A protein has these predicted regions:
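Low-complexity, polar-biased intrinsically disordered regions enriched in Pro/Ser/Thr/Gly
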Residues: 1, 39, 95-99
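Surface-exposed interaction patch
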Residues: 3-58
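Signature of Gram-negative chaperone-usher
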Residues: 43-92
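C-terminal, structured domain-capping segment
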Residues: 7-25, 73, 78-123
Length: 123
């Protein structure tokens, strides 16, 4: 799929993160390909995966999951703040010839957030 079509997809994966602590937190939001230990098939490399991300109504992307090293957002979330996300995922059209040969490959994408919270200001 082209980047333009990928970013225009109506179907999105909607989620939010909320800081329920008493201090700001520095976070990394990752989209990882976590393959179950019981899976014995072929795994799709992240170099074929593109994403677009909408954060509180502002759009970012397209981005290659491989090029961003799986970190799709990195920022500060303040106490009691909620950040809303809409994510679109597609296969990179520029790698179309490779993708034609990947019919039996699977991806096991999972969101993971890592955060460090400190009582002092993070501005």
């Amino acid at each position: 799929m082209s980047d333009e079509d990928g970013l225009m997809q109506e179907e999105t994966y909607d989620f939010n993160i909320k800081n329920t602590g008493d201090a700001p937190a520095k976070y990394d939001l990752k989209l990882i390909n976590e393959v179950p230990s019981t899976y014995t098939g072929k795994v799709l490399d992240t170099k074929y995966i593109k994403i677009g991300l909408e954060i509180n109504g502002t759009e970012y992307g397209p981005m290659s999951l491989e090029k961003v090293k799986n970190i799709i957002d990195s920022d500060i979330i303040y106490k009691k703040e909620i950040i809303n996300f809409k994510m679109r995922i597609w296969l990179d059209k520029t790698k179309e010839k490779d993708i034609e040969n990947l019919e039996d490959y699977k991806a096991f994408l999972k969101l993971k957030i890592e955060a460090v919270q400190r009582p002092e200001s993070m501005d």
